[in-house]
């Protein structure tokens, strides 16, 4: 089951990245890992960075509820580490998005799904 879930996650992240590229984003990193947490996708469009959490579930509604506050905090902490490791992006605006993936559905991109104050 773990292996199947891992591969399903990779597939969802590939779909999410392709969707972002089609929307004009450039993918800067995938599965950026730190001791504080992981960011599924770091994407850039113009002077904006999007730290994207990808959630794949049986339905888009189920995926929408899958990002917990604890996960949000880990993503925020990982984003801070990413920004420290990439000072060339320190002047960019940034936000935390979610990409919801479900079978036989177009991905749903939630802009600003959460913020650093949550």
From Swiss-Prot:
Q: Which Pfam families match?
A: UPF0102 (PF02021)
Which GO molecular-function terms appear in the entry?
Answer: nucleic acid binding
Q: Where are the transmembrane segments?
A: none
Which PANTHER family does the record cross-reference, listed alphabetically? Answer: UPF0102 PROTEIN YRAN
Similarity comment text for this entry? Belongs to the UPF0102 family.
Name the record gives this protein: UPF0102 protein Nwi_0116
